[in-house]
Amino acid sequence: MKKREHITRVLVRGTAALLAAVILTGCGKAKLPEGFEVSAVKEKAEQSIELFNARDYEALWEMGSDELKESITVEQFAQACDPYLDKCGAFEEISKSVVMGGTDKNAGIDYAGAVMVGDYEDGKIQFTVAFDQNMEMIQFLIK
């Protein structure tokens, strides 16, 4: 149970930071921290979505930072992601994307992230993906 609580805290904190960045900067006009490039962040986020769509959760997990890998297993990724793909059907396209960045003052790290909306045969899935300075994934949220 403690591991699940830790995962929830990490995901909630990351989501709150990304949402605050979007709200405070006018929907994605946030300047990325030094060392990040919009094109690289967008490309990495799209790569993670491609792996999600292919149900290649091991490769998706491998994109993660050590902290992310310690907080979730490949099997947990599958359990969380499969229902979305089962419900929404075949992937069509990314219809919206916003790239932003900020600093996690608690962890003392700069991060960059993307919020992307994927259109699927039977619905939409919103992805929030964030990366640290090494471009390792520190967050992968779907809703």
Q: Residue spans of the language-model regions?
A:
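Exposed beta-sheet edge and beta->alpha loop/turn motif
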Residues: 98-143
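Bacterial signal peptide processing site
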Residues: 28-30
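Short, aromatic-enriched amphipathic alpha-helices that serve as compact interaction elements
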Residues: 37-53, 63
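Bacterial N-terminal signal peptides that target proteins for export
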Residues: 3-15
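C-terminal motif of bacterial Sec signal peptides marking the signal peptidase cleavage site
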Residues: 23-26
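Short solvent-exposed beta->alpha transition segments
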Residues: 58-109
